[in-house]
Amino acid sequence: IGDETYVTFASGGAFTKFSHEFQTICTAGEDVLYVNADRTVAVNEEVLDDATQELGVAKKTLSPVTTAEVGNIFKFGTEKSDKMHVVYKDAEGKQQPIYLASYGIGITRVMGVIVEKFSDEKGLVWPEAVAPFQVHLLSLGADEKATEIYETLTKAGIEVLYDDRDLSAGAKFAESDLLGIPCRIVVGKRSLESGKAEVKKRTEGDATEVAFDDLVSLFRK
């Protein structure tokens, strides 16, 4: 989401005049930013007048966009440490003030934005960099072989969500699409005959067959 996230001038609340928010373009977001054409300036609507004056930017050069906040920075300077009489000694033994700041990231907010931005009509489409698992392994009446593959993959350091429930293939496929793990491996009775598993990326429509012995190398980079 980095390419669609702005460092934004925003209200500092009770702490400072301004803060820096990290705002991601998201139609489900609750904030409105005003952004210039080359995306070098982004101002939260709540401080639009004060911030444009501070930055020397004309409001007419900014356009609104709906966003969701995923993180923030409050810079306190030395105000807080001065009140607490907190200092440090430098290399020359002189007392120096300590600069304080608060750096926050909203983990649940980030997840919500990912859900909004990386999904389709079937469900989630987790980006590989943040997916909770690399592989969704489905057993369709071939539990013994599927369990063997699960153990082989996990021993190789590959994160696997294993579904060995007694459900129909259609139900398992639908739930797999809903969860959106980057890659799905299906092991069924046909797999036992061919010695190959069915492998399908969540972002692609077609599946391919991969030999059991080649599955580990498929996920090693």
Regions found by a protein language model. Give the residues of each.
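NTP/phosphate- and nucleic-acid-binding module
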Residues: I1-K221
